[in-house]
Curated annotation (Swiss-Prot):
One BP annotation, GO: methylation
Protein name from the UniProt record: Cobalt-precorrin-5B C(1)-methyltransferase
Keywords from the UniProt entry: Cobalamin biosynthesis, Methyltransferase, S-adenosyl-L-methionine, Transferase
Signal peptide feature range: none
UniProt pathway annotation: Cofactor biosynthesis; adenosylcobalamin biosynthesis; cob(II)yrinate a,c-diamide from sirohydrochlorin (anaerobic route): step 6/10
Catalytic activity: Co-precorrin-5B + S-adenosyl-L-methionine = Co-precorrin-6A + S-adenosyl-L-homocysteine
Length: 381
């Protein structure tokens, strides 16, 4: 089973289409070189062909993450390629973050930031494209890459993309080639091994940050949180909190999107939605405890999702939203400390920071605020 993240399949299709365009024979597998690694991986390609009398090419791949419940599983990827004369193929950057020889277009089904219209694509995905396409681009040419995900918009409607300000399709935000199975025992084991390794390093200062999923990782890096302190946790937050305390962590920061962390404020410490949800119920409880009006509490309780409830509240009563999320951040810290002390006596300080649908840090508990302020970061008001 080829368990690779969506960016890998995108790059494989782009590389296959480029090979066809420059006269190479079609191969049903493409070798993909990885950033900062000597080895490469073999990625299956469904088809590839020349278009417009050889002026353009198209290749198709199908994302296979290996996860039955993964939203990207089976997604069809179309990569259109076209070469143009006149580029120096220098390594200079342009505004969208790509070198000047690579003209990247997010086609139908690829997520874009609502605020700017720019494609939602991670640095890993950008680097992967550059590393694998640059050797194939003839000297003096530039390459236009257009990626289309025919089912992308429909698939994205089942995700929390809009909560991050991403619209029109699926994000290309993987930070590594291999899929991490966020709800499996193996993923918990891997996270514990990473945690143990970080805590065993001579330079370890007792501080760690748990980020939740790819969006959390992407934002943590953009905000400049210390990379050597970051662990992407997936869904096994409870056992990892305890493991952090056992391994001598003094200050722990929980950094992520409210859609995951809200569960901690309700005492749910395995956050995969197929195992435990209850987010609307937790949100309703938080609103009640903050003294929000009954009409708004009823609105929350009848919402189809946390995101829909928040969007409605932001329009009708933005002050209520701020009260609810501030309460949530505080409850996350309280419930997390209580969870850890259920298993061992620990003085580990646990802070929480939540970001909003515009990808801004907006809410924090008291400890979370102290920790980000010590890094020179402030909350968006």
């Amino acid at each position: 089973m080829n368990q690779f993240t969506l960016p890998v399949w995108v790059v494989a299709a782009a590389k296959s289409a480029t090979n066809i365009l420059i006269g190479n024979k079609f191969r049903d597998k493409e070798r993909i070189d990885l950033p900062n690694k000597e080895e490469s991986i073999s990625v299956p390609i469904s088809s590839s062909a020349l278009l417009d009398n050889g002026k353009r090419s198209l290749a198709v791949s199908h994302c296979q993450s290996g996860l039955p419940l993964d939203i990207t599983r089976g997604v069809e990827i179309w990569a259109y390629i076209q070469l143009s004369k006149g580029s120096s193929q220098s390594k200079g950057k342009v505004q969208n973050g790509f070198p000047d020889w690579l003209d990247f277009h997010a086609g139908c089904g690829v997520g874009k930031f609502q605020s700017s219209g720019q494609p939602c694509i991670s640095q890993f995905a950008r680097d992967l494209l550059c590393i694998n396409l640059y050797p194939l681009v003839p000297k003096g040419n530039s390459i236009k890459v257009e990626i289309i995900l025919p089912e992308g918009k429909d698939r994205a409607s089942k995700t929390s993309n809009e909560a991050f300000g991403v619209v029109d399709g699926l994000s290309l935000i993987g930070t590594q080639a291999e899929v991490q199975i966020s709800a499996s025992p193996d993923q918990l084991k891997n996270c514990k091994e990473i945690l143990y390794h970080k805590c065993s390093e001579a330079k370890f200062d007792g501080c760690l940050t748990f980020v939740i999923g790819e969006n959390g990782m992407d934002l943590a890096m953009k905000y400049g949180l210390p990379a050597n302190q970051i662990i992407k946790t997936g869904n096994w937050l409870g056992p990892l909190l305890v493991a952090a305390a056992e391994n001598g962590v003094k200050k722990l920061l929980l950094f992520g999107y409210h859609g995951k962390l809200i569960k901690l404020s309700g005492g749910v410490f395995h956050t995969h939605h197929h195992l435990a949800d209850g987010r609307i119920e937790i949100l309703t409880s938080l609103a009640f405890r903050e003294g929000i009006s009954f009409d708004l509490i009823e609105l929350i309780s009848k919402s189809t999702s946390v995101e829909n409830a928040l969007l409605t509240l932001e329009v009708s009563n933005p002050d209520a939203v701020s009260l609810i999320w501030s309460r949530m951040a505080k409850e996350i810290e309280i419930k997390s400390r209580s969870y850890v002390n259920r298993y061992l006596s620990s003085s580990m300080e646990i802070g929480s920071v939540l970001f909003d649908r515009k990808r801004q840090m907006r809410w924090a508990g008291l400890e979370g605020l102290k920790q980000i302020n010590s890094l020179g970061l402030i909350l968006k008001r």
